Amino acid sequence: SQSIKLYNQLANHKLFNKSINFDLKRIKLVLKKLNNPEKRLTNVINILGSDGKYSLLTSLKFFIEANGQTTSAYISPSLKNIKDRFWLGNRYITYKEIKKTLKLIIKQKIPLTTFEVLTVIYIINISNRNNNYNLIEAGALFAKDSTNLFSFPLIQAVVNINKQHLNFLRKKT
């Protein structure tokens, strides 16, 4: 499937790696080279924690859209395929849009983790859309998570943090 091919391309590309590396310098540099598209996003709602992020995000999305407003959404991990991660306001991202954005990221020649690449794909594809709210599922280690790029999020909601993640957390997280 196209989804598996894209995941393999990410996993096997020399600039991208699957490791976890909590450092925002790389992703900030890529975004700076791309004219800081994250700064065009307003009404960001970050959802942090271990368990329940997807449930909260989809509930918020439903309530907001039922009220006639538009949302974008970034979830992790995918439920069925890579496109599931990216809701652009009225539809999921297309494979063509993912590939086009991936080429743009590769041109920057900056090594990124796979999660950082996916985050940049989301940011680029929603930065010129006028969604009323942008819902972003973050990791439990939010302070160093690649989704922690927005200067003034509207809301930062925290759901349950399970015991297996507690050993990663520090006072400033």
Residue ranges and their predicted role:
Residues 24, 31-32, 37-40, 65-151, ...:
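ATP-dependent carboxylate-amine ligase catalytic core
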Residues 55-59:
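Hydrophobic positions on the alpha1 helix immediately C-terminal to the Walker A/P-loop
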